[in-house]
Amino acid sequence: MLDNPLIQQVLFEVMEEDVVGFDVLNVLIDSNEVTDDEISRQLEVKLNNIRRILYKLYEARLVDYNREKDEETNWYTYTWKPSLEKLPALVVKKMKNILDELKKQLSTEENGMFFYCMGCELKFTFEDAMDMGFRCPQCGGVLHEYDNKKDMATIKEQIAYIEDEFNQNPLFFKY
């Protein structure tokens, strides 16, 4: 399941782009139940970093924990376990949001006219370019009409990829 690119992208966002999170998830999946301290030792990563990742995963409801108090030391031990059954629904929700944004962006690209500063590599809508007198606000250079066919093709490819994943991957069928 974790080798799916859409799932990886969503997990990457959940873990705020911390790649160690994938290692943490793999340890959880392999062990089924493990303490944060054991994960820290196994991965040779600071305990605080492991806990931060676990809390992010917990907020997304992708892990659960049990808390036990050691009667001798009065310290709590947290045992973590994966709870990935909610992952497909989370992926679908996030990907639908991305899909909506891509479709809005495509509509803007299809219905708009754009201008481009070759020096600064900045793109502007016709309205913005007109307001600026067809001059770049950063370098003062002349703005040129921009052919956005490649941009539209890229957006269409991204939309098709996500829609294909939803339609062909059994992981997402019930959502």
UniProtKB/Swiss-Prot annotation:
Q: Which domain of life is it from?
A: Archaea
> Known SMART domains for this protein?
TFIIE
- Function recorded in the entry: Transcription factor that plays a role in the activation of archaeal genes transcribed by RNA polymerase. Facilitates transcription initiation by enhancing TATA-box recognition by TATA-box-binding protein (Tbp), and transcription factor B (Tfb) and RNA polymerase recruitment. Not absolutely required for transcription in vitro, but particularly important in cases where Tbp or Tfb function is not optimal. It dynamically alters the nucleic acid-binding properties of RNA polymerases by stabilizing the initiation complex and destabilizing elongation complexes.
Q: Look up keyword ATP-binding and say if it applies.
A: no
Sorted keywords for this record are: DNA-binding, Transcription, Transcription regulation
PROSITE patterns reported in the protein's UniProt record: HTH_TFE_IIE (PS51344)
> What is the similarity comment for this entry?
Belongs to the TFE family.
Specify the protein name.
Answer: Transcription factor E
Q: What is known of its domains?
A: The winged helix domain is involved in binding to DNA in the preinitiation complex.
Species of origin reads: Methanococcus vannielii (strain ATCC 35089 / DSM 1224 / JCM 13029 / OCM 148 / SB)
List this protein's GO terms for biological process.
regulation of DNA-templated transcription; transcription initiation at RNA polymerase II promoter
Q: Does the keyword DNA-binding apply?
A: yes
Q: How does it assemble?
A: Monomer. Interaction with RNA polymerase subunits RpoF and RpoE is necessary for Tfe stimulatory transcription activity. Able to interact with Tbp and RNA polymerase in the absence of DNA promoter. Interacts both with the preinitiation and elongation complexes.
Q: What PANTHER family does UniProt report for this protein, alphabetically?
A: GENERAL TRANSCRIPTION FACTOR IIE SUBUNIT 1, TRANSCRIPTION INITIATION FACTOR IIE, ALPHA SUBUNIT
List, in alphabetical order, the Gene Ontology terms for molecular function in this entry. Answer: DNA binding
Please state every residue range assigned to the domain named HTH TFE/IIEalpha-type: 3-88
Q: Which InterPro entries match?
A: TF_E_archaea, TFE, TFIIE/TFIIEa_HTH, TFIIE_asu, TFIIEa/SarR/Rpc3_HTH_dom, WH-like_DNA-bd_sf, WH_DNA-bd_sf
- Give a Pfam family name: TFIIE_alpha
